[in-house]
Amino acid sequence: LLMSLHWLDAVEHIVVRTFEHAQKYDVRVTFAEARSRRAAHALARLPGVQAVEPYRATPVRYRFGRRERREVLVGAVAEPRLDVVLDAHDTPVALAENGLTMSTKLAELLGAKLGDVVTIEVLEGRRPVLRAPITSMFETYLGTPSYMRLSTLNGLMREGPRISGAYILADSAYFDPLNRALKNTPMVAGAAFRSAIINSFRETLADTINFMVGFYILFAGTLAFGVTYNSARISLSERGRELASLRVLGFSTLEIS
């Protein structure tokens, strides 16, 4: 029962670490296609926007030895503030100028370690094949993310300063007009508000956690009943043997009772 209730604390820890300590933006905007940095300046002029941080999400296939993984490589600014990469101690991880910052889980799946050079097959645009060392690693509870400096990624792809979206920090009083403005912006393919993501995350796990808690409560109740019943049967059996022994010794039923 205590183990089942521990899941609630674990989920809350994931929510706080992921959606408060690491992801500090209010809206994640995705463009219909990669655009120039001017698109970020256009977002900064929308209602209630306080800060804009561009990123580039590129589909890639990682290869290391005989292993490969299809993932998304995120190009981030040199010192991200709205979507921060954290280590196990919640300390921001610096993105090296020339190299990959990879989750430990992804590195494990590839069989790679810190300092290994990984082949990166880009699956969009000119589809270049790149090679980059793993310069830093970090722990994460969700997914198998990987990062590279935005300027480095754009340089390797030889496409100039391009971005595929942006993180927005906004005044909560302007969320509704901001949402309407984003829906009316042709270059925007989607806008995900962090509050909606958190609610969806909680709702997705709620049914599973409630089922697990209910199962463990039922299991604990059944186990407690079984232990109590078994103890009562043993006690009754021992009492019966004691009474039988007294009868053998010559005591009458009245004397035993």
Regions found by a protein language model. Name each.
Residues 1-257:
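Alpha-helical transmembrane segments of bacterial inner-membrane membrane proteins
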